Swiss-Prot record:
Lineage: Eukaryota, Viridiplantae, Chlorophyta, core chlorophytes, Trebouxiophyceae
InterPro entries in alphabetical order: MFS_dom, MFS_STP/MST-like_plant, MFS_sugar_transport-like, MFS_trans_sf, STP/PLT_plant, Sugar/inositol_transpt, Sugar_transporter_CS
Gene3D superfamilies reported for this sequence: MFS general substrate transporter like domains
NCBIfam families: SP
Organism: Parachlorella kessleri
UniProt subcellular location: Membrane
Family (UniProt): Belongs to the major facilitator superfamily. Sugar transporter (TC 2.A.1.1) family.
Name recorded for this polypeptide: H(+)/hexose cotransporter 2
Gene: HUP2
Length: 540
């Protein structure tokens, strides 16, 4: 979804030499991961809670009376596609992402200069303040200001938390713990949907729904005070002794010299590039494939239409005549499918590769969008706003198929792949670019979807299906497989690609030539050593 956040990807060739018991996995790592992962709950809870409260009559009556009046009209006198079309209602949803995009322009610099832990602390305070304002909102302005503060908090958290998890995780389990952030987002969504279902009949239940967003913020706030800073951040900022002590604490052993040396070497390399230099490198011809692919994946992730579904699915079902409690229950079912499918991604991403999941997910999402459009186009023309329960159940099943496809493909991979193709030179700017573009298009979709549905009717689902076709072809023809690719070989991987090699021009050809020379030297060494595998030949 807007779901997720940047994932730091670091490849260490000596990781197999660290020799930690159980690969470095221990109870302390679990506590660190669970506490820091509450940053994902912040994001997920906000995504999940928004659509539910906008379908609650008390909320609409207080802040959006014109929409409330439309919902009370007889079913045969209202247009099911336009009942909730209102720019102010869409601003309530989308202002969150506009604020997150603004923060992302400088969040990378704050994370690098101040550290991951202080950034998480600031993010949790901002989110807590936003939750408080929303819970106590007396008018639309107060509501939107609260949403902006929530966006500031998530914008900072999405830049810091995944990086924190990655740098604390043992190398052997780094990929799995990185994906845990996306899992936390999906859990946050379903928790919010369950809260909405429970508060729908309460007096001012929407206040409780919005206010409970403060719970994960409090967890992250306490965790930010108690958890250690990451070894990488401490070492980058010149605190090597403290960095080694934290590393030993995380690994539950003093035998951390090899990993400590690797972190020091990586930190030394990364500090060679300021954030300004990182942005300059990203926009150079040599790294233009990373810029284009990162930006397109971030944009296309939102053009799947997932956030339109997650934000507005209760509104969608309510518009088609489903009872409010049933509409909210449908969101819980969709949220459960979202969580289950994310587990599929965690366990299959390193088995089937990134391209395989992208392609399968694209085909499945396309089918889901087209079938949804066809069913609504036929059935709404026949029944208006009183869809039969069997038809509503069929739409729910198709949406679940679509959401599952997203959750094991474009959801987590939309963040993972951009992180894997960033070199040391471009990492800071590249991941900021991913967040900025993602939040920008989340804002656009959030602000436009209800108006698009009113204007395009069932065709809005074909609009997103068309984009799914484009992104699937993009993956097939333009995206190299990044599974297991060391970060230092990423530019060469793009230089060998049929399209990106042309984009990189002379720089790309030079990289390929250097790689061929290196390989030729390795082969020559193996031949001279008397063995094809590079080991000394045995005496006969």
């Amino acid at each position: 979804m807007a779901g997720g956040g940047p994932v730091a990807s670091t490849t260490t060739n000596r990781a197999s030499q660290y020799g930690y018991a159980r690969g470095g996995l221990n109870w302390y790592i679990f506590i660190v991961a669970l506490t820091a992962g509450s940053g994902g709950l912040l994001f997920g809870y906000d995504i999940g809670v928004t659509g539910g409260v906008t379908s609650m009559p008390e909320f609409l009556q207080k802040f959006f009376p014109s929409i409330y009046d439309r919902t009370q009209q007889p079913s045969d006198s209202k247009d099911p596609y336009c009942t909730y079309d209102d720019q102010k209602l869409q601003l309530f949803t989308s202002s969150f992402f506009l604020a997150g995009m603004f923060v992302s322009f400088f969040a990378g610099s704050v994370v690098r200069r101040w550290g991951r832990k202080p950034t998480m602390l600031i993010a949790s305070v901002l989110f807590l303040a936003g939750a408080g304002l929303n819970a106590g909102a007396q008018d639309l302005a107060m509501l939107v200001i609260g949403r902006v503060l929530l966006g500031f908090g998530v914008g900072g958290g999405n830049n810091a938390v995944p990086l924190y998890l990655s740098e604390c995780a043992p190398p052997k389990y780094r990929g799995g713990l990185n994906m845990m952030f996306q899992l936390a987002v999906t859990i946050g969504i379903i928790v919010a949907q369950l809260v909405n279902y429970g508060t729908q009949t309460m007096n001012n239940g929407w206040r409780l729904s919005l206010g409970l967003a403060g719970v994960p913020a409090i967890i992250l706030l306490i965790g930010s005070l108690l958890l250690p800073e990451t070894p990488n951040s401490l070492i980058e900022r010149g605190h090597r002794r403290r960095g080694r002590a934290v590393l030993a604490r995380l690994r539950r052993t003093e035998a951390v010299d090899t990993e400590f040396e690797d972190i020091c070497a990586a930190a030394e390399e990364s500090t060679r590039y300021t954030l300004r230099q990182s942005w300059a490198a990203l926009f150079s011809r040599q790294y233009s494939p990373m810029l284009i692919v990162t930006s397109l994946i971030a944009m296309l992730q939102q053009l799947t239409g997932i956030n339109a579904i997650m934000f507005y699915v209760p509104v969608l079902f309510s518009s088609f005549g489903t009872a409010r409690h049933a509409a909210l229950l449908n969101t819980v079912i969709i949220g459960a499918v979202n969580v289950a499918a994310t587990f599929v991604s965690i366990f299959s991403v390193d088995k089937f590769g990134r391209r395989g999941l992208f392609l399968e997910g694209g085909i499945q999402m396309f089918i889901g969008q087209v079938v949804t459009a066809a069913v609504l186009g036929v059935e709404l023309n026949k029944y208006g706003t009183n869809l039969p329960s069997s038809t509503a159940a069929g739409v729910l099943v198709v949406i679940c198929v679509y959401v599952a496809a997203f959750a094991w493909s474009w959801g987590p991979l939309g963040w993972l792949v951009p992180s894997e193709i960033q070199t040391l030179e471009t990492r800071g700017a590249g991941m900021s670019m991913a967040v900025i573009v993602n939040f920008l298009f989340s804002f656009v979709i959030g602000q436009a979807f209800l108006s698009m549905m009113c204007a395009m009717r069932w065709g809005v689902f074909l609009f997103f299906a068309g984009w799914v076709v484009i992104m699937t072809f993009f993956v097939y023809f333009c995206l190299p497989e990044t599974k297991g690719v060391p970060v230092e070989t990423v530019p060469t991987m793009f230089a060998r690609h049929w399209l990106w090699g042309r984009v990189m021009g002379e720089k790309g050809r030079a990289l390929v030539a250097a790689d061929e020379a290196r390989k030729a030297g390795t082969v020559a060494f193996k031949v001279e050593s008397g063995s094809e595998d590079g080991k000394p030949a045995s005496d006969q």
